[in-house]
């Protein structure tokens, strides 16, 4: 994937030319745009910008172009990361707030070239989650992944909500690279609830929280009444 040369990272460019790279070129339509997941690669010491050469990272390249052929320029497209779109990995069976580009110490480089926008996603290695379905999601605007944008089915499958403009790709990771212990340690280290919740479970939780708020408000009201009586 030659666009990685734009990042001034010869090591990463070489990694994308190696046998370890997976070239995908999968395409989806998002509003007025055509989005292509070009490819991905995982490994240690494959980018000169990674301070720890022993740390394994995952990189993925996504391109965006207007479906009608109009070239993207700085005047008609916000190419900065999390400008027009947010790009993030997600993992089935995990709360989207716990496993995403932000919690995975990730970053996304972006630039315009020949009328297209390119995004290069860089995160901690996703291979530890490969015994689950691992997604790459792209959605409009800037916001951290949440249940407002994503829903989870009973089997842990993650999907965009109907009112969210975006798309999701499945990353073809080798299941033999999975490390459930490392995955568990990671999600617990975030301090964020990581067990998935369906819409039905979220509704029950919300109802319980509303009830607790009502009880708390009633308690304050009763205390005020007793104070007034005492006076």
What are these regions (language model features)?
Residues 2-231:
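Alpha-helical, hydrophobic structural elements that either
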